[in-house]
């Protein structure tokens, strides 16, 4: 995790993985701001790309105090989850480690709880 990115194996397809994650977010009241289908957009211009989709999500209640404490954190918020398929056709769900974001932007450790719960939600989506 030297890059700050955590990769979690998913037994579901890329679209199914993100649909599961979106359902979990809906239950928890977490906003989904956008779903970007990188591979779908590539196909529209005649390029091939393994299935790759990005979900942008967050909660102003959780994220705003973080950005007040560390304004440059806004470059990494809202949070993102990337579902992608590797060369062996295995699907992964990747996201920025909350601890890495805390280290990168230097927001107070007591605010880490505002985003730390993402790990459990990601894990639930791929089970």
Model-identified regions with their sequence ranges:
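Beta-strand/loop substructures that line and gate deep hydrophobic ligand-binding cavities in soluble
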Residues: 80-108
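Well-ordered alpha/beta subsegment
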Residues: 103-127
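Terminal, regulation- and interaction-focused segments at domain boundaries
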Residues: 1-29
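Compact, glycine-rich, soluble single-domain proteins
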Residues: 33-79
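Short glycine-enriched loop/turn motifs at secondary-structure junctions
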Residues: 2-3, 26, 48-50, 86
